[in-house]
Amino acid sequence: MLIWIPVDDSMDKKHSKIAKLFELKQWALVNFDAGEVKSTRFFKTREEFDEWVDFIVLENKYEAYMDFMNEGIMVLCVREEKTIEEITEAFKFKELDEMGF
């Protein structure tokens, strides 16, 4: 599964922090498979990667998420998690909230 996470400008795969969409510096693309992170890559824009992405994780439930849903991407929201490592751990245990209409 591929997961987009909007992050700050740190390129640290474990410690980059999630950012609001209007504050993001780059996108982290996490390849998550069999309960673990296989790889993490960083992109300035989502358009730089043109393959199907399954999920996007947003910083809060007030973010503008409808465009992602219209693209067929499942939208999740963190509770208290901040770093990529914390978010992927919460993803593994289904501890992220699902956004809906």
Question: Predicted segment positions?
Answer:
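Non-catalytic interface/targeting segments
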Residues: 1-47, 52, 85-101
